[in-house]
Amino acid sequence: MGPIGTEADENQTVEEIKVEPYGPGHTTPRGELAPDPEPELIDSTKLTEVRVVLILAYCSIILLGVVGNSLVIHVVIKFKSMRTVTNFFIANLAVADLLVNTLCLPFTLTYTLMGEWKMGPVLCHLVPYAQGLAVQVSTVTLTVIALDRHRCIVYHLDSKISKQNSFLIIGLAWGISALLASPLAIFREYSLIEIIPDFEIVACTEKWPGEEKSIYGTVYSLSSLLILYVLPLGIISVSYVRIWSKLKNHVSPGAANDHYHQRRQKTTKMLVFVVVVFAVSWLPLHAFQLAVDIDSQVLDLKEYKLIFTVFHIIAMCSTFANPLLYGWMNSNYRKAFLSAFRCQQRLDAIQSEVCVTGKAKTNVEVEKNHGAADSAEATNV
């Protein structure tokens, strides 16, 4: 996650000078920032064809992410029947991804292509903080969704999280994430680095207290990896394994209740896919960052910058994948998306699939009578 900040020493050669990435969220690579003065030092990211591919990749992610996540937020706000607790959490994921798409990725692409920080000191502190914040909010929200569904389905609890409490949980998620990401904004340095005599570049690097290779950066990096990736995914995995086992072994007493049970399975399956996409897309970048934290010689790889950029692009794909999953795997979102594009408020078509009708309430009562109760809003989106 967040690596140790470094500064260029006057005795270092061009080949030795490295600049650290942003930290949790990794909006920029640690590769050389300066245009290399000698041809043999040019890395692949400076090749025209590679730059074209990077521009197309980042622009596609930004476009798909902005459109898809904006659409998710729009339908949850517009259609009353979509305003369930689970959908509020899903909309919160969309807000976090939208933050990355609009505030982080454009500057990341610019930084990668230009080789130095041209966006000023304010954004030097703000951009890495924003992406670290967004990633942490996403992780916390996915964990909350998993625990809520586990509570309702595995333990047969009737009481659900109220809409008011869901907003409180969302606020706490942002507040806690803001505190955890704050070192990314505080321990940041906007400075000039002399590459060779009479040649300087503007760098935006981590600057931790103490010596040049401070232990604080490594501690923060590994702690963030454990607390904000490994531990949450462990909790989420256990929760969904238990949920899936419960649903698989449950015997429905009637046709109506069987339909309700099937909808629970479909919703759970969709949310599991969301978690898998998030975990898999971020895994290469986290693994690569862990390798750097363990052995700083990884920074000396000629294609370090290209490897980092490829892994970063893979991680950023998670910011537009969720809306595609919703449209593909959930009929409510699919109908809501189509209605939004047609500028029609077809609440009747959407409501027929949401457990807010008398039929759904009847299904809930049947579930209660057979010891398998679940929140209507917690099991349907």
UniProtKB/Swiss-Prot annotation:
Per its database record, what is this protein's job?
Receptor for neuropeptide Y and peptide YY.
Give the sugar-modified residues: 11
Q: Which residues lie on this side of the membrane: Cytoplasmic?
A: 74-87, 147-166, 239-269, 327-381
Segments in the Extracellular topological domain: 1-52, 109-125, 188-217, 291-305
Q: Report the subcellular localization.
A: Cell membrane
Q: Which PANTHER family match?
A: NEUROPEPTIDE Y RECEPTOR, NEUROPEPTIDE Y RECEPTOR TYPE 2
TM annotation in the entry: 53-73, 88-108, 126-146, 167-187, 218-238, 270-290, 306-326
UniProt keyword terms in alphabetical order: Cell membrane, Disulfide bond, G-protein coupled receptor, Glycoprotein, Lipoprotein, Membrane, Palmitate, Receptor, Transducer, Transmembrane, Transmembrane helix
Entry-linked SUPFAM superfamilies: Family A G protein-coupled receptor-like
The protein's matches in PROSITE patterns, at most eight in alphabetical order, are given as: G_PROTEIN_RECEP_F1_1, G_PROTEIN_RECEP_F1_2
Q: What is this protein called?
A: Neuropeptide Y receptor type 2
Keyword field contains Repressor: no
- The gene from which this protein is expressed is NPY2R
Record membrane topology:
Multi-pass membrane protein
Chief location category: membrane
> Which protein family is it in?
Belongs to the G-protein coupled receptor 1 family.
UniProt region (Disordered), positions on chain:
1-37
Gene Ontology molecular function, alphabetical: neuropeptide Y receptor activity
Task: Give a Gene Ontology cellular component term annotated to this protein.
Answer: plasma membrane
List residues with covalent lipid attachment of type S-palmitoyl cysteine. Answer: 343
Cystine bridges: 124-204
